[in-house]
Regions:
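A short, proline-enriched helix->beta-strand linker immediately N-terminal to the Walker B motif
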Residues: 152-157
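Conserved ABC ATPase signature
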Residues: 134-138, 142
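Catalytic Walker B motif of ABC-type/P-loop ATPase nucleotide-binding domains
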Residues: 159-163
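ABC-type ATPase nucleotide-binding domains, specifically the catalytic core motifs of the NBD
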Residues: 18, 59, 74, 99-117, ...
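Helix-to-loop junction immediately C-terminal to a conserved catalytic motif
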Residues: 54
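The feature captures the beta-strand-to-loop junction immediately N-terminal to the Walker
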Residues: 39-41
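ABC ATPase NBD Q-loop/coupling interface
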Residues: 63-80, 221-224
């Protein structure tokens, strides 16, 4: 059987908070080994979209298709077994556990694609150096690396990253970009929420611009770079 064209396909996704509609009929795709960003102002619906794809936001309609199979009715654990990995903007680090315990705690959901602890330490050497530190003793950038590494160790092949560069020093943002490009080269897909458009342009293949819960522009990276100022003015960013 031929491999599905898209790792992820979202069709007609709408979502609500009570009576307030947060997403309006969103369509998007993420290919195998592709990095796609969601760009927009605060409140545009970017995080709600990630949460809906992961199955964490239940007040949603439309379909989420993973590797050609409709996953819309699956709970978050079942979607994780299909290869989805969620990295929230608060990183979700367990304060009472060491770095290594944080890495080992989540279950391996896809053994065939799970990174070993040695693979994690090879790609994230700072985590080996800090293995016995409490997770929340790490810097913001180190915590972001830990959150990403933990999801890769579980076997995720499509990462949902929410604002990975937020609040980080430029040199750390550069390192996060290097990691994203490395896992992309290994075939991992990424759907990335990001307001740092300079960073987004260094890692992404395509971009979806969101405003008031709608995708208002979809562009490849070359067009995004060429029209950057115009687009940011349009979005009020």
């Amino acid at each position: 059987m031929a491999e599905p064209t898209h790792r992820l396909e979202v069709r007609g996704l709408s979502a609500w908070y009570g009576e307030a509609q947060a997403l309006r009929d969103v369509d998007l795709t993420v290919g195998h080994g592709e990095v796609v960003t969601l760009v927009g102002r605060n409140g545009a619906g970017k995080t709600t979209l990630l949460r809906s794809v992961m199955g964490l936001h239940r007040h949603a309609t439309g379909s989420v298709v993973l590797d050609g199979t409709d996953a819309s009715r699956l709970n978050p654990d079942a979607r994780a077994r299909r290869g989805l990995g969620w990295v929230p903007d608060d990183r979700g680090i367990y304060a009472s556990l060491s770095v290594e315990e944080n890495l080992l705690l989540p279950p391996v959901t896809r053994p065939e694609s799970a990174w070993s602890l040695e693979q994690v330490y090879a790609e994230f050497p700072v985590l080996r150096e800090r293995a016995d530190f409490p997770g929340t003793r790490l810097s913001g950038g180190e915590q972001q690396m830990l959150a990403m590494a933990r999801v890769l160790r579980s076997g995720a092949t499509l990462l949902l990253l929410d604002e990975p560069s937020e609040g980080l020093a430029p040199v750390i943002v550069q390192r996060i970009g290097e990691i994203i490009r490395t896992i992309k080269a290994q075939g991992t897909s990424v759907l990335l929420v990001e307001q740092n458009v300079t960073f987004a342009a260094t890692v992404a293949d395509r971009h979806h611009l969101l405003a008031q819960g709608r995708v208002v522009e979809s562009l490849d990276n070359d067009e995004f770079r060429a029209r950057r100022e115009e687009l940011l003015d349009h979005l009020g960013m």
